[in-house]
Amino acid sequence: MAENNARSPRLLVTLTALFAALCGLYLLIGGVWLVAIGGSWYYPIAGLVMLVVAGLLWRSKRAALWLYAALLLATMIWGVWEVGFDFWALTPRSDILVFFGIWLILPFVWHRLVVPSSGAVAALVVALLISGGILTWAGFNDPQEINGTLRADATPAATSSSIADEDWPAYGRNQEGQRYSPLKQITADNVHQLKEAWVFRTGDLKQPNDPGEITNEVTPIKVGDTLYLCTAHQRLFALDAASGKEKWHFDPQLKTDSSFQHVTCRGVSYHEAKADTASPEVIADCPRRIILPVNDGRLFAVNAETGKLCETFANKGVLNLQTNMPDTTPGLYEPTSPPIITDKTIVIAGSVTDNFSTRETSGVIRGFDVNSGKLMWAFDPGAKDPNAIPADEHAFTFNSPNSWAPAAYDAKLDLVYLPMGVTTPDIWGGNRTPEQERYASSILALNATTGKLAWSYQTVHHDLWDMDLLAQPTLADITVDGTTVPVIYAPAKTGNIFVLDRRNGELVVPAPEKPVPQGAAKGDYVAKTQPFSDLTFRPKKDLSGADMWGATMFDQLVCRVMFHQLRYEGIFTPPSEQGTLVFPGNLGMFEWGGISVDPDRQVAIANPMALPFVSKLIPRGPGNPMEPPKDAKGTGTEAGIQPQYGVPFGVTLNPFLSPFGLPCKQPAWGYISALDLKTNEIVWKKRIGTPRDSMPFPMPVPVPFNMGMPMLGGPISTAGNVLFIAATADNYLRAYNMSNGEKLWQGRLPAGGQATPMTYEVNGKQYVVVSAGGHGSFGTKMGDYIVAYALPDDAK
């Protein structure tokens, strides 16, 4: 018995020393590797110290606590020197060390260190208190936040559209893409009382043949007393706006397969026929119609009252968008965003499969008669004559740059503004023609009636990073030097917001050309300069090893090693066989959610992201042929291995993640922010989102850690001084004070909310509605919910 009692204390000391030794060996070996490739000396030094601590513990010497206290304090000093008082950046540098330090001061542990050393326990306690104090201070003083207050003054802006205040009749409420509502029943003072008003379930869930990239991104529209929305499979629903009850639904019978790169519908468009532009037959058949784009290349016109097809439109209500396409394989051309509707024209473009081959279908933009569906014009960005209409023997151009995001429209100028993508394959461009380069990654302004080019502005030259313009542009009239200027705001993946006079494409906010890294892959080249807007959320400095992150110092070390193994010289570092760190990453700092602009206050709300990706070019060889095998289809995703058939390299595209699946760049990965559009200053910026729904295990209670999470979807703003946003990787709809960014309310969603909300009023009550259906590749919970919130009847 005495022998067993003696073994027990010794076993505890042995296990403690063994843990310290394993930590030390890991840090020493990994740290030497890191230093050899140009990284920090901290890790091998910390590893050596931990090995000495382990030796002292093995010998039961309390001097180990002195040395460990010194290591802990040195680590905190080093951490603050590297990243400042940033809680989330300090956490992986300190968490294991702090927990192990707490273990060492437990009485049943240090009492077993029988060789005394004066003050050792007290020294470690002091070191832990100092470390805890630093972390506590950092937790309440976020260096990434900007804490200002927007101006409250407002001047009613002129409007070119006659939209009833209570309606939301287009994707961005108006076709200017402002995502702003003049409603103010819900205010910053009462939004905390918001309650769930109704929930509608569409019944549209992931099917066995669907790709991983099935997403629920719809923003419903509301006209009169009816909501109109589409589901992931483009089923169209009309709901009573007050109760959420179904009025009718229409199913286009979309047949998908796993090669589709997208299965999604961001919204539908509305048109009311007018006697001066529509025949009596059209008005009798479909006086009010919903225009529904479908991922297999069809466009439907549906009677807004009955849900029946409009017989006088195209082929009994169905328009074939695959006509004259160079490749009509379903899924290669996918209209995923609602078209622009003018009094005369439907203007529609579509998504083209990224990174598949050099023989993909065209990204042509077309204008169709809104009443008959007849082709009025075409603009093929990759053709020598973009406006040439194909004959029966002639098709549109292979691999023309496409425009997949929602467009914007100025009715006064009759100009439609299209955010353009890059010619695919995206990550190698040595074979692109001048025509394919001409309008790629540009803002394109076309006459909506004729399709003729008004102007274009290119935001990335010879794009090798898939830095397409992916957000709906926003139109507003802004005061510049005392003069009102009609401008267009074009948020870009790079974090730049390009601001141009929408009449002529001239820059309103400077965007000087600056040199960028050189050295393209074999057979390619890199543009010598790129435009950098003065209005930007671009990172203020390039990433370094200090910006690497992890759950612990161990996976943080792995991320630092991976970082130094990649090619990275800042933004626009060219793709490489070595592997290139792409930051801002492929999701972009801005994505399809766009920004919200209050035209009266002349302020904007934005939700930028900061998530690096890694691209790696794969030379042709066994298993990586130049030409596609027979019957080859798309991969069904934009990430992972992409074949890029027809060019010298395939490519892999992935988020830059740690071994635990966490981003290797330290948080925040997502922000909510406000801009003063008169001064072009960022007034406030806050982290948004918690890891609650990204944890490796279910969390029964909310996780109060506001890390700043990745997101997909945009904000809306209201005259009630409230902004609403879902979008984040946790399942919440949130409300913020527009003036200062204070979070006022959040509502738990039943599934992922990767969609932009909307708001409207019916029967005297204001509602806020969001789609909660999840996002396949984003990894959020899938569902089929449309959720509405409103104030209770007795709210004050």
Spans of features found by a protein language model:
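Topology signature of small-to-medium multi-pass alpha-helical membrane proteins
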Residues: 1-149
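Hydrophobic or amphipathic alpha-helical targeting/insertion segments
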Residues: 99-114, 119-143, 239-246, 264-271, ...
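N-terminal pre-domain segments of enzymes
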Residues: 133-183, 530-538, 543-554, 633-638
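Repeat-blade elements of multi-bladed beta-propeller folds
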Residues: 168-172, 213-233, 260-298, 331-358, ...
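Extracytoplasmic/lumenal domain signature
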Residues: 192-205, 236-258, 271-276, 283, ...
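Segments forming glycine/polar-rich beta-alpha architectures that bind adenosine-containing cofactors
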Residues: 502, 574-575, 580-612, 617-619
